[in-house]
Amino acid sequence: MKIAITMAVVMLSVCCSSASSDTCPGFFQVLEFLFMGSESSYEAALKFYNPGSDLQDSGTQLKKLVDTLPQKTRMNIMKLSEIILTSPLCNQDLSV
């Protein structure tokens, strides 16, 4: 469970890097499928990007971990993602 939350934070930090304006809109859709979609919809979203079997398998493992989180937690992670991604602070470097 901690791995899934850690991965969510990592993905958000990638989105909110100084290059976030160049982030593919499809990435946000994949993130939504990761937290709110079915395993098959998430896998289909990943396949669109031709990740190769190792990366596809890793993504599927991540989805299985995320699915062990309570629904409310997954919904709150999506809300947190939206708050972070729409914040004017998103483009600032938050490294400590």
Curated annotation (Swiss-Prot):
CDD domains: Secretoglobin. GO terms for biological process: signal transduction. GO terms for molecular function: phospholipase A2 inhibitor activity. It is found in: Secreted. InterPro entries: Secretoglobin, Secretoglobin_1C-like, Secretoglobin_sf, Uteroglobin. SMART domains: UTG. The keyword Secreted applies. GO terms for cellular component: cytoplasm; extracellular space. Pfam families: Uteroglobin. Residues 1-21 form the signal peptide. Keywords: Disulfide bond, Phospholipase A2 inhibitor, Secreted, Signal. Antiparallel homodimer; disulfide-linked. Interaction with LMBR1L is controversial. Binds phosphatidylcholine, phosphatidylinositol, polychlorinated biphenyls (PCB) and weakly progesterone, potent inhibitor of phospholipase A2. PANTHER family: SECRETOGLOBIN FAMILY 1 MEMBER, UTEROGLOBIN. This is Uteroglobin.
